Amino acid sequence: MDILKSEILRKRQLVEDRNLLVENKKYFKRSELAKKEEEAYFERCGYKIQPKEEDQKPLTSSNPVLELELAEEKLPMTLSRQEVIRRLRERGEPIRLFGETDYDAFQRLRKIEILTPEVNKGLRNDLKAALDKIDQQYLNEIVGGQEPGEEDTQNDLKVHEENTTIEELEALGESLGKGDDHKDMDIITKFLKFLLGVWAKELNAREDYVKRSVQGKLNSATQKQTESYLRPLFRKLRKRNLPADIKESITDIIKFMLQREYVKANDAYLQMAIGNAPWPIGVTMVGIHARTGREKIFSKHVAHVLNDETQRKYIQGLKRLMTICQKHFPTDPSKCVEYNAL
């Protein structure tokens, strides 16, 4: 019995020496006792205990959200509230959550931009974007200043210099549709860029107060929007991968425009954009025989304006250039479309 009491006393003394029990604590972990014994053993052997690397270095996480949350208190608010609202709306996010301050909304925007840097910009108001760009150019001019007597060309539109005349293009137009697709695509590209240049020169020749008016800004934005709409068409023409049915229709349109047959060009445009056969409604494939409506589904008869957004845009841009061509290179009223409206 005395041996048991002495052993209990020794264990109790060992726990007290190791300082394992703190105030108001009646138990300790076995791992803490083992760690204390290990330290005592190394001290008796003369080894110097070095802290582990995990204790020296802070715990890092591969999660960018956690890292951002740890450091977000140090970040100043570098964007205005209006810019934060605009960027959040672009990404379809609420501009303010319940109980959120302006700084919290800014931090939330930063997290969204880090996690999803790419934003879907497919469907948006292109005309408004062009107007905003023109307004920004005018604002930059006001901030930057201008020397007296200096010509104001900062806000002029880009002019495509094709180094050609309408007479040369009309001569080239006689060879359109003769079977040489590559030559036809080159003529189409040259003529459309020529019309864009004519349009830009007309807008650049306006007085400065006209350029700064609401209607003047709208006209400039329309020209820029048309140029951006036609870029996919120019790319397809350059790479020679324009679909055959689209190429055939555009060739007819350009040929009639060069002949100043604007009514025929408009008819060819409507044939391409709208088509002359509606898409059949209802079931067209029942059994082993196709129904009568199925025969009308053909690429030549279907509206290309409904195919995709890119085609719709450059078809719309082509129609605007048809109007510009009729305005600058007029002909008999019987061959024009809406002659009195121009």
Swiss-Prot record:
GO terms (BP aspect): generation of catalytic spliceosome for second transesterification step; mRNA processing; RNA splicing
Record bears the keyword Methyltransferase: no
Residue numbers carrying N-acetylmethionine: 1
Primary location: nucleus
Subcellular location: Nucleus speckle
Top-level division of the source organism's lineage: Eukaryota
Pfam family, one: PRP4
InterPro entries recorded: Prp18, PRP4-like, PRP4-like_sf, PRPF18
Function: Participates in the second step of pre-mRNA splicing.
Subunit structure: Heterodimer with PPIH. Interacts with PRPF4 and with the spliceosome. Part of a complex containing U4/U6 snRNPs.
Protein name: Pre-mRNA-splicing factor 18
